[in-house]
Amino acid sequence: MEKPIVAIVGRPNVGKSTLFNKLIGERRAIIADEAGTTRDRQYGETIWNGRVFTIVDTAGLLVGDDDPNLPLAEIVRRTHQQAQLAIDEADVIVFMVDVREGLIAADEEVAALLRRSSKPVVLGVNKADTEDRRQNAVEFYNLGLGDPIALSAYHGTGSGDLLDEIVRHLPAGQEEEEDDNSLKIAIVGRPNVGKSSLLNKLVGEERVVVSNIPGTTRDSIDTKLTYKGIPITLIDTAGIRRRGSIEQGIERYSVLRTMKAIERCHIALILVDAQEGPTAQDTHVAGMVLEANKGLAIIVNKWDLIDKAKFSYEDAKTTMSQVFHFAPYAPIEFISAKTGQRATKVLDIAQTIQSERNKRVSTSDINNLLRAAVREHPPTAMHKGAHLRLFYATQAQVEPPVFLFFSNAPEQVHFGYKRYLENRIREQYGFIGTPIILVFKGREEEQTVSVSGKR
């Protein structure tokens, strides 16, 4: 079931990211952070009074938005852009203001935009960390957005009141969708890369164009089909555009809609335009897929329009591998949705990835691999004068694959050594198109069997 989305908007330096971090706490998913995949995490789940929802820091979605040195006019424009994105995509909007600066014109302009929308708005007056400042929060009644909630995102005071108000405005909970056991594939990518064309080619029929109704939201479009005996649900974000989806003539990602599609899917297919090449937005969304621990494939569309004499398949494959270097295990396929060239190959790839995500490695096999890896490249860290030791490993779960490693000092295992072990696992067992998660835990030495052969 899709979780409601709560978007935080506001000018630079009002405390959006501080509030975001306070509300989501420490993210539990354990994956490797690598430069170039995502910026600071912009979204995370939280639960309050039994309701689970996704919090989004819209400043993180729009590059450069939290630069306090921007000219005032640019700050206003970008804050408007944040607000419009939230109006387009979120279920509840948290509008953050700064009590220390008081009510300023930039806040009033954004408030006017929010009042014209049909979305519920919760007004958070931040940096109210003294009694006088809490009293000054009443000034923000003038924004016409209801009761201002005085809080200090840094200290956490008032955050409970804010969460109460957020939950009060969340849409009514929906019944859990019946599990149809189909393979759920999300087709994501920038506008005009051919998402609709690919979907139409796969299902063999023209899709109805979704009407653009200002002020409303729609769930992603689901299309069901069967391919090689496997039931498949295609989750399509194509055609879903809002009045706010065009900014100075350049269409931007429907980022929050893409997040919902990624949340629901097993496998995400990121479509890249062969003529334009991959963009920072494409790598950003790929990072979102990896953050969610979903399967990933890179699909390069419009390959029929490329002059192969000037830009060969090998050249294109090298370029894509370099851009998506943080996911070297993700398959890359070149297609033409328009002509149908290799279009159904994407379904074969998705089925392969799903099989890889459900692959299990026996405990004896993973420990044989660990012994060999430690023998060839021992960990060099020290713990209380003793060498770091890895005793034992086992696969804990599938979809995504999770491996547990037991050590005398799990916190001392270096990121580089974790990557080494991941590479050894992939060399031996593949795990094409899926993140694998390595978790290191402590265990008393006498309770384990040492794979290093030493006691």
UniProtKB/Swiss-Prot annotation:
Q: Which InterPro entries match?
A: G_ENGA, GTP-bd, GTPase_Der, KH_dom-like, KH_dom-like_a/b, P-loop_NTPase, Small_GTP-bd
One Pfam family per UniProt: MMR_HSR1
State the superkingdom.
Answer: Bacteria
- Which GO terms of the molecular function aspect are on file? GTP binding; ribosome binding
Q: What does this protein do?
A: GTPase that plays an essential role in the late steps of ribosome biogenesis.
Which cysteine residues pair off into disulfide bonds? none
The family annotation for this protein states: Belongs to the TRAFAC class TrmE-Era-EngA-EngB-Septin-like GTPase superfamily. EngA (Der) GTPase family.
Can you tell me which residues bind GTP 1? 10-17, 57-61, 126-129
**Gene3D superfamilies to which the protein is assigned, alphabetical:** 3.30.300.20, P-loop containing nucleotide triphosphate hydrolases
The KH-like domain covers: 359-444
| Binding residue positions for GTP 2 | 189-196, 236-240, 301-304
Q: Which GO terms describe its biological process?
A: ribosome biogenesis
Q: Please state every residue range assigned to the domain named EngA-type G.
A: 4-174, 183-358
Which PROSITE patterns does the record match to this protein? G_ENGA
Alphabetized NCBIfam families for the sequence = GTPase_EngA (TIGR03594), small_GTP (TIGR00231)
Name listed for the protein in its UniProt record: GTPase Der
Q: Does the keyword Repeat apply?
A: yes
* Subunit field text: Associates with the 50S ribosomal subunit.
